[in-house]
């Protein structure tokens, strides 16, 4: 238990343990995109990144973004560049460069991403092929997913959600088990 008597001792231990110190720093500065915000894409496919998400990006010092189609759902995913690089490093570390199938997996993973930048007004351009893949025409919904942001077409986001009862049961099942190791991103 943390109290004023042992606080100094705990920080002395943290100071000697670079891994623990790194993990504490990581926990304090990690990005948190939360909530859902509706927006509109213009005729060119430009859309404003919601101000709350821009503030999180600016606070992290990472304003470069990577955009790709979600692997499992009909939405797009915006990654801050630092998070994207971590994902690439994890995937590359698990794949064998000398295995043809694994090279194809990596090639497809990195070839389906595009760097996007915010203009002076806080907008970014969603390329036409991504608009088509996600079914985005005009109405857009941003959903903060912690370290990434999902971009959905109009009402498609709601269709992907569970009912309240189903969500409660799923969450109960997950929380009743031991947590997985923290090595995944």
What spans do the regions from the language model cover?
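Flexible "stalk/tail and boundary" regions
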Residues: 1-36, 43-44, 53-121, 129-185
């Amino acid at each position: 238990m943390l109290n004023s008597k042992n606080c100094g001792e705990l920080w002395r231990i943290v100071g000697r343990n670079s891994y623990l110190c790194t993990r504490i720093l990581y926990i304090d500065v990690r990005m948190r995109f939360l909530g859902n915000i509706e927006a509109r894409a213009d005729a060119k496919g430009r859309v404003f990144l919601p101000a709350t998400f821009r503030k999180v990006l600016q606070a992290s010092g990472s304003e470069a973004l990577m955009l790709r189609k979600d692997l499992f759902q009909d939405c797009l995913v915006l990654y801050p560049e630092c998070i994207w690089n971590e994902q690439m490093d994890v995937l590359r570390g698990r794949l064998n460069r000398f295995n043809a199938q694994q090279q194809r997996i990596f090639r497809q993973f990195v070839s389906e991403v595009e760097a996007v930048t915010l203009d002076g007004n806080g907008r970014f351009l969603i390329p036409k092929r991504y608009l088509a893949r996600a079914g985005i025409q005009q109405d857009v919904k941003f959903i903060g997913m912690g370290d990434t942001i999902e971009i959905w077409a109009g009402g498609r986001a709601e269709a992907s959600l569970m009912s309240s009862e189903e969500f409660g049961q799923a969450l109960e099942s997950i929380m009743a088990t031991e947590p997985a190791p923290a090595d995944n991103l």
